[in-house]
Structures are given as C-alpha cells and as structure tokens.
Amino acid sequence: MLILQCVRPRSAPYAHMSGSLPVTLAESLFFNPINADFCLPHPTHRVDFPFEQYAKVLGHAPPADWKPPSDECRRRHHHRPPPPPPPPHGPPPPGYPPPPPPPPDDFEDDWFWDEEGGPPPPPPPPPPPPHGGPHGHYDPSCDPMKLSNLDEGLFDPLTTALKQNKPKIKNVLLVTLESTRKDMFPFKKGTHAYDTILSSYGSPDAAETLDKKLRNLTTTASFLTGESTRFEEDAAFNGTGHLGAWASEFAGAKGGINVQGAVTGSAYTLKSLITSLCGMEPLPVDFTDEVRAHMYQPCLPQILSMLNKAEQAKGKKEDGFLSWPWDTAHVQSVTDQFDSQYILDDQMGFRTFVTDDTLDDPASGHYPPKEPRNNYFGYPETETLPYMRDLFANAKRDNRRLFVSHMTSTTHHPFAVPAAWPGKETYMAKRRFAPEADEFESYLNTIKWQDGYLDSLLSMLHAEGALNETLVVMVGDHGLAFKASDDCKSNFENGHIANFGIPMLFLHPDLPRVQLDIADAATPTSIIPTVLDLLLQTDSLSDASSEVAKGLLPRYQGHSMIREQRWSVPVLNYSSSSASSSPYHDPYDFHHPHDAPNAIIDASFPTTNASANTHPFHFSIINPGGSLLAISQSHSPYRLVFPLCSTLPLRFTDLSSSPNEQTVAPLIAWSVDAMVKAVRARHGDDAAAWADLARRLGEWWFWEQRRRWGYHLPARSTDRGVVDGYAVGQIRKKHWWET
C-alpha cells in the first residue's frame, strides 16, 4: 500500500480512482479542510464584508458617506440584472466547461470593436451564484478595500525632475524576473542569505574569500535600485562598476522609483503576470483557470489599443511621437505552452510573440539559436536579444510606439546556466549528502547570470537609442524558498516569507532616484496605475489619449507609486445623478467592447481622506492557487497564511521579531479560535484582532474574486472532473501520442 501511495498518478481523475480505500477513508475522516466551503463552486452561506470588525481594528469609524456599505453598492453586487440573452451560437458561460480552447489566431478579443466595425456578440452569462452578481465585474467605488492616492501630490524630487529634465516616455518595457527574491536584488552582506552561505564554512575566517565572490553577484541590480550591497568594494553602488555604457545615462541621483517592500500577488508565475500586466488580482483556484473566466479589467496591451482607437477617432495628428500608434509584444525564450499561457497572452491583448518556437523556426530572422537549450522550458534569455533589438529598431523606423513584456527564465528550476558561461562560482562549502546546498548554489549562479543579462538588455536599448525614451519596469514574479537558507523548500503550498518579497522598480534616465520604504508595501497591481500616471505626468500622451488614461487610472485596484502613500476612500456622490441608476448601465463594466474610449471619461468617483491608520491589505495566492492564501498589510508586521481548500493549518508570524520567519517559530493552529487564542497569548490583543480580521477578509476576498471573474468551478484542479481538470499545470503536447 505504501508503494502504491508513492507511485499512483496525481492528475485528475486518477488521483481519486487510484487511492487505496483505507487511506482515502482515513484522509476523509481525519484530514478535512478547516473551511470546506472553499472547495465548492459556491459558498453554502452568504459571505459579507466585515465592516464593523474592519472599523474596529483600524481604530476609527469610516466616513459617514463611505460608499461601499451603501444601498447602491449592495444593489449592484447582489441584484444586478443579467444582460440580454446571447445568440444561440455563442460560447459557453465563463467558468463552465468549454470546448477545447481554440488556437490564439482564432481568439476574438471582446475588449475591442471587430474588424467590421460592430461589436462581437457578448458571452452568455452563467446562472447567478447565491452570493453575488452574475459574472465578472469590478466597481472600485464599491470596493471596501479600495484605497486611492491619486489626490496626493507627486514625490518632491519627481516634481522637480519633471520641470528640469522633461523626461520623455515613448516606449515601455516590462521585465518579469522569474523566481527572483527581493533579497537577491541586490544581494547584500549581513543579510540572512549571506549568513547562510558563510555558515556553511563553519568558520568566520572564510568571509574575506567569500566576499570577493559575492560582492559582484548583483552589480546591475545594485546600480538600478540604488541599494548598497554593503561590501567594502561596492563598485556598482559607488558608480564605478563594470557595467555597459548605458550606466552613464543614469548620472547623479537619477534612476527611478524603487519599491523596497513589494510583495507578489501570486507565487505562481502566470497568475503573477495577471497582476502586473492587467492590474487585477488573480483567481484563488488551481493553475491558470483565469483563461476560462472573464477578465474584469483591460490589460496593458488592451489599454494601449484603446489609446490607438482614441487617436483614430480624433483624426488630427499632433506633432512628435504623441500620436504614433502603439505596438505590443510578449517576448520569452521558453515555451508558452505550459498551463495555457498561449491563451492567456492572447486574451491579454498581445499580438506579437517571441517564444522558443520562434527561436526554433528556420524562417525566423535570427535562426539558428547560438546557445543550446539550458532547461526543460527552453533557451537562455540572451537568445531573444536580437528579436527585441528588431522590435525597437522597427518601431523607431516606422514612427510607432512600443510596449514589450519580457519574461526571464534561467532563474527557474533546474537553475541551469548556459554551459559556455565563464562566470560560474562555488559559493557554498561542499558537504557530503547536502543536495539542498547544491541547489541553492545553483540558484545563486543563475542570479549572477541574470544580473549580467540585464546589463546586456539595457546595453541593447542604449545602442538602439531607445534608453532615454523608454520606461523600464522590472518586477519579480515571486520569490523562492530553499532548504539551505529558509528551512523549507519551493513555493508549492508554502507560505514562507521568502516566496513573497520581490523587486519592483520603475526606471528612466531622466527620473530622480526615489526610495519607497519597506513599510510602504505594494503588489504588482500598482504597475498599471503607475505607468499611466507617469505617461500623464511626463506629457507623453496626446490630448485624446490623455482623456482615456485619466478615465482608466482610478479604476484599478493598485496605487500610483509616484505619489505620496497617503490614502483616500470612495464616498457617495451627492452632487450628480449616479450613472448606475439605470439598471443596465454601469460605468465600471468593461464587458461592452463597443463602448467608445470616450465613454469611460465620466466614470471617476469622489473620495475623502482616510484615517492615518488605514493601510492597504495584500492578498497573495500561493502556488498552485486554490490551497493557501497569504494575507499581509502595509505598515504592519503581521502575516497570516490562511488555508483555503486545503488540510494545511493556519500560520501566523510577526516579522518585527522574526523578519525571516525563523528567529521565532511561527504560530500554527488547526482552527480559527485556536489561532486567535495563541496569537493573543504571544503577541497581545491587537495582534489577535488583526489575525481574526485578516481571516474574515480572506474569506470575503476569496468569494469576491470569484464573483469579479465570473468563475464558478471547484478551487482544486482534482475536483473539476476529466474535462475541466485535463492538462492544467502541464505543457501542451504537439501530438496526441506524446506523453
């Protein structure tokens, strides 16, 4: 029986079919989820936002005219009538079993007009779930978690730089750094990671030799962030690093905004892309089932398409690049066939793709690849540089603007650097029977390789004359825990803090260096608001495009990272009739692709200042998505790992006393009452109240995200049946006989 438990298949439906009966019965009797509702397509009871508890923990009553508790918002969330019936040939409802997904070329993007000038038919709505609206929908003015800083001023250095340097943003490059922990960007002496490496030698005398190797581990990252590595010879931080000519463009105090406290929205790469590229929080379900649901916000490529349509509607061209059309591309050196990424990329609005298939295509402009494949997903990122160079060169030649999403991959397991790379080092002391140390060392080498690659990437932009007119956004998709450094391994169903801290920075040679404090934590959902705000503040959009951007900016769940981190909350608008008074009109509903871009301009909402104790909560989905949720809050040291459809326990930590969650053992409990009691005994009443509120917020957020996405299938892939659970979390094969 033990052997069968080890070798039996894990994918649906075999995971259920091949379980040994005694073990399966024992699991059902003794290992049940703390809240089994999270395993179901719908809750068994109504789940409301804990308004009173939220106000009590914050220590103040909300404004009397705070909009989310109003009857208007309750009607919108719970009694919104369905849209007109669909045509009989329409696609199946979002969240319900669809036919096999079509190839990207057949995908019809319902955010925009079709080629004939009329809108494509709307998808049919699923039956209204018991707890809320009929399908995907988000209204920021009715979101009790919505905090806005758009009424705040820009950071002082930024205001001065905009007047003096007049930065120009013609292009945007968003680089997603695979599995890149914040403590590796840059790597610093004296950190827990450094101490882990040094301790492997058993003697502090090894520090001098070790420092010579480690001080150049993340030269580029140190220069870009403006954070010292704390080594005596900190060449990059002192401006004398061996970087490309591009570094001279960032003279003095220039560089951009470095968000030191960034937290991932998901420890699963493709869900993390949804937060950064679409400004949406992902679905708390296994794998990328967002492709079966309905995106409730336009992603960045779709926003840029809206700007193109606004320019077309205006007709009159403005001088310079402001009226040039935007092109979009997604570039990676690995496959896009894993877990439906090829569908997700297309649904996001990308129309140009570079993947490993491009590199393998004899008809490609830079075939054959110069390097062999270095992992089971594809090639090293350097193979994409010629293709990205072509994108920027062609955009410049054709008077077009460019948005490129680029994802690295070498830092992903199995942590293999190109065989011909000469920079490989030995960092950890060799110990017999210690494969976990070998794996961490391999990861460190991929971090060093990636750092050099970023230098090459910026050198390419500089050589093409695009660096001074390109906003470069760098963000990690998630962190990664290692047994050697964190006493736990991987990000799979693992709520350790090492899996969540990520780099996030906005770079431009004419922007000043702004360091956002670690306490001002943010998630990648703030990337789109920040990019739009920067385009507006630098006068990098035409009048027509600016109107669209201004209308879109307040809609998103994230915040602008170029403004003071003080908050306002939505309030009722007594001065004008609500646009939502018509039961079929909603200014925040993006499900009508035939709406003209100027139809969104009047959708802003009034706000009032929030209490000084009000700070954003952050919800981070843990790989694979439906089992655990990590909950944290800006300016709070507390973290709660909350089980969803999982037999795992609750886990509470206080980062003020245990920044790496190892100095003090986490509190573990198997019931909410036991957790609150344990937190109160160790950390006091305030911490206990926070933990209980975080648990209530997590429960509400779980079902609210399903309502927003219009998704009503089980959270775990093994519970979705043969059709819905097939091939999720796997690479799609080209032939049926491939296994």
Where are these regions (language model features)?
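Membrane-interface soluble catalytic domains
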Residues: 2-16, 77-78, 82-84, 91, ...
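Active-site-proximal alpha/beta segments of enzymes that process anionic O-linked groups
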Residues: 4-80, 95, 103-119, 128-174, ...
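Beta-strand elements within well-structured catalytic alpha/beta cores of enzymes
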Residues: 102, 165-187, 304, 401-409, ...
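A structural signal for well-ordered alpha-helical segments within the folded catalytic domains
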Residues: 170, 215, 219, 294-302, ...
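Histidine-centered active-site microenvironments of extracellular/periplasmic hydrolases
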Residues: 188-192, 462-512, 574-575
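Substrate-binding rim/cap in mid-to-C-terminal beta-strand-loop elements of soluble/periplasmic
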Residues: 257-283, 431, 489-546
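Histidine-centered active-site/metal-ligand motif
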Residues: 410-413, 478, 485, 739
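Short, flexible loop segments at boundaries between secondary-structure elements
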Residues: 432-441
